[in-house]
Amino acid sequence: MRIHPTAIVEDGAQLHDSVTVGPYSIIESGAVIGEGCRIESNVRIFGVTRMGAHNRVCHGATLGSEPQDLSFTPEKARPLIIGDHNHFKECVNISGGIKSEGGTRIGSHNYWMAFSHAGHDCVVGDHNVFANTATLAGHVEIDDHCFLSGQVAVHQFCRIGSYVMIAGVTGVPQDVPPYMLADGHRARLIGLNVVGLRRNGFGQEQRTRIKQVYRLILRSGLRLDDALQRAEDEYPGPETKRIVAFIRASRRGIVSFG
């Protein structure tokens, strides 16, 4: 273990022997940091944080900080659970939980660019990219393989489905279903995330099926329940199943199309 002499590692913090801690960083009692993690300079890791292996935390980042919620009191604190192989760039802030027993949960292989933020009780999957200053309000859920561009702001309790791309400076007030592109001052669906799907190995047949499913759901004029059922019947497959399940589970509704 390599700990810079100016760093503060409180008694009760649990660090794997292979962890490195840079100058002026603070790791509070109760924090758990797994194998191969690299903590750079001026980082603060709060005691509610539980971190897996091979994460990199860059200058000025804060992980597990107090939720930005006026109702917060220390006895309400819930954990921040982080998986493996995440990269937190400069001044990233991830809050601990407050209102859900599981707390704030970050999966694995996520890339958080400078000044990006996840609020309390967010649940983030794997292989996502959050560009500079992308912001998730409390209780937001992000699935897998999403790309949120710079200055995207997601309203609390919204859900973002897998393989979604959201354009820069977009405000997201409702759920964004899987495989889609969203853009606008208030997000609107503008088409399929074709580039993202190609990069993740989706073939032409899969992309065509996804497009057919969304054309049916968004443009057929059918009642939503009827359109979802018809999509399942006419275009069976894992992509259809993911889309239909996501929309049926929506509490805030889906962002508009076009």
From Swiss-Prot:
Alphabetic keyword roster: Acyltransferase, Cytoplasm, Lipid A biosynthesis, Lipid biosynthesis, Lipid metabolism, Repeat, Transferase
Entry GO terms, CC: cytoplasm; membrane
Record's signal peptide: none
Pathway participation: Glycolipid biosynthesis; lipid IV(A) biosynthesis; lipid IV(A) from (3R)-3-hydroxytetradecanoyl-[acyl-carrier-protein] and UDP-N-acetyl-alpha-D-glucosamine: step 1/6
SUPFAM superfamilies in UniProt: Trimeric LpxA-like enzymes
Compartments where located: Cytoplasm
Catalytic activity: a (3R)-hydroxyacyl-[ACP] + UDP-N-acetyl-alpha-D-glucosamine = a UDP-3-O-[(3R)-3-hydroxyacyl]-N-acetyl-alpha-D-glucosamine + holo-[ACP]
Single GO BP term: lipid A biosynthetic process
Pfam family of the protein (one): Hexapep
CDD domains per record: LbH_UDP-GlcNAc_AT
Enzyme Commission code(s) on record: 2.3.1.129
Subunit structure of this chain's protein: Homotrimer.
Name used for this protein in its record: Acyl-[acyl-carrier-protein]--UDP-N-acetylglucosamine O-acyltransferase
Taxonomic placement: Bacteria, Pseudomonadati, Pseudomonadota, Gammaproteobacteria, Chromatiales
